Regions:
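Extracellular/periplasmic solute-recognition and catalytic clefts
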Residues: 1-47, 184
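Second-shell loop/turn segments in exported
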Residues: 4, 44-48, 55-58, 99-107, ...
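Ligand/substrate-recognition segments at binding pockets and active sites
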Residues: 14-15, 109-188, 230, 255-258
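Ligand-binding "clamshell"
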Residues: 16-31, 175-178, 191-206, 263-267
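Periplasmic-binding protein-like
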Residues: 46, 50-92, 143-144, 244-252
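Extracytoplasmic/peripheral linker and loop segments enriched in polar/acidic and small residues
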Residues: 54, 109-110, 158-169, 195-264, ...
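Structural transition elements
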Residues: 79-119, 138-141
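Long beta-strand-rich cores associated with HINT superfamily self-processing modules
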Residues: 260-287
Length: 287
């Protein structure tokens, strides 16, 4: 952007934006949009300790999604607030007042961690050691990983991170060679049929890397997909969200805050909330 390229289309981190603005001044401009890509942690259903729902829930409850996500958003391109599986504030998303009642999303992190540690003790999983598979890309993977490690350790857990290049990371995720793994759920529309497909039974979707089977979720998914009344569909979708969040096989981290950097000579481009939208360059020109 400083003379070699005209734009960075994937996204820039907050420190990168500070550097670009300092070096380029008025010669750089930025556009921002919340990307419809949710970062999640998928827990392996084959890991013995994770077969206990209380252990999965406790791991989820150790994460401070309120103050913690605000801090994380200052160093990488993640949203500064919690979300369920559906994009927050979208038509079918759980309202905040309902989401924040669910364990792992409450605002009282001290009480949440105290209860989580009691649940781990009850399950015989105090000081649980488990592997966390990370993709060897700085933003936002390393930043999310380091943050999650620190959150879990506050509950006495002992996660061990294994970081691999993309090809090996993808192979490990696909073959289930992990206890927990960073994962993501991209979409181009905030629609439950698109955004909940990842969380139905693994014999119906290849993107369920936890590999669990849940026919109740399948039934709710099919029910909302065939419902044309918005209010009735929303009620079914909320049932799905609450059940999937309670099951805690896939733990939402947050959505992506996408900010692209453009040389100020680039005009006419409008950022989209998906990497696959608005890529025709129609109307884009150099001034």
């Amino acid at each position: 952007i400083g003379g070699q390229i005209m734009a960075e289309w994937r996204g820039t981190s907050p420190p990168e934006r500070v550097m670009l603005k300092k070096e380029m001044g008025d010669d750089v401009s930025f556009q921002a949009k919340t990307l419809m890509t949710l970062w999640v942690v998928s827990l392996n259903s084959k890991t013995e300790a994770f077969k206990n729902k209380k252990v999965r829930q406790a791991i989820n409850m150790c994460i401070d999604r309120h103050a913690g996500l605000k801090k994380l958003a200052k160093i990488t391109f993640t949203a500064p607030r919690p979300s369920g599986y559906l994009l927050y504030n979208s038509t079918y998303a759980l309202p905040d007042e309902e989401l924040y009642k669910i364990p792992g999303f409450t605002k009282d992190i001290d009480a949440s961690r105290k209860k989580a540690m009691a649940m781990l003790k009850e399950a015989g999983a105090e000081g649980l050691e488990f592997t966390y598979s990370n993709r060897a890309v700085s933003h936002p993977y390393d930043h999310i990983a380091i943050w999650l490690m620190s959150e879990w350790k506050k509950c006495g857990l002992k996660p061990k991170m294994m970081t691999n290049p993309t090809s090996k990371f993808v192979k490990i995720r696909r073959e289930g060679g992990f206890d927990a793994t960073i994962d993501w759920a991209p979409s181009f529309l905030p629609d439950p049929t698109l955004m909940h497909f990842k969380y139905i039974s693994s014999d119906r979707t290849a993107s369920n890397y936890s590999k669990y089977i849940d026919r109740d979720l399948d039934k709710l998914f099919d029910g909302q997909a065939g419902e044309t009344d918005v209010a009735k569909r929303k009620a079914i979708v909320h049932q799905f969200e609450k059940k999937a969040l309670e099951n805690a096989w896939v733990l939402p981290v947050t959505y992506t805050d996408r900010v692209i950097a453009l040389n100020s000579k680039v005009k006419g481009y409008v950022i989209a909330n998906s990497h696959i939208l608005n890529n025709t360059w129609r109307g884009v020109y150099l001034d």
